[in-house]
Amino acid sequence: MVHMHITAWALGLILFFVAYSLYSAGRKGKGVHMGLRLMYIFIIVTGFMLYMSIVKTATGSMHMWYGLKMLAGILVIGGMEMVLVKMSKNKPTGAVWGLFIVALVAVIYLGLKLPIGWKVF
């Protein structure tokens, strides 16, 4: 399940940057954007399934940390969607990029720090 979730995130980020580059170039990126929205659903479903499997065995404050990671992941998805919608409407995206970057760094840090992640920290 972890590998499906990581693969979904990788594909989601690739589709996000492809759609962003299409919107930046002034071309239509609607098809890629719709594919990205499908990946959002897959990311959320696999993340929720991981969270439910962790809740059964986690002890101490692990529930809270995984809950915060899930919240930050949803903020990343929201930030990605807001960036693309604002780009498609030719509106400024500075603040939304800030939300996206901060949430993405938080998700990556928590993903590497928590027990299921890699032991980098």
UniProtKB/Swiss-Prot annotation:
InterPro entries: UPF0344. The lineage of its organism: Bacteria, Bacillati, Bacillota, Bacilli, Bacillales. It comes from Bacillus cereus (strain ATCC 10987 / NRS 248). One of its GO terms (cellular component) is plasma membrane. It is found in: Cell membrane. Pfam families: DUF1516. It is a multi-pass membrane protein. Keywords: Cell membrane, Membrane, Transmembrane, Transmembrane helix. Belongs to the UPF0344 family. This is UPF0344 protein BCE_1257. The chain crosses the membrane at residues 6-26, 38-58, 65-85, 92-112.
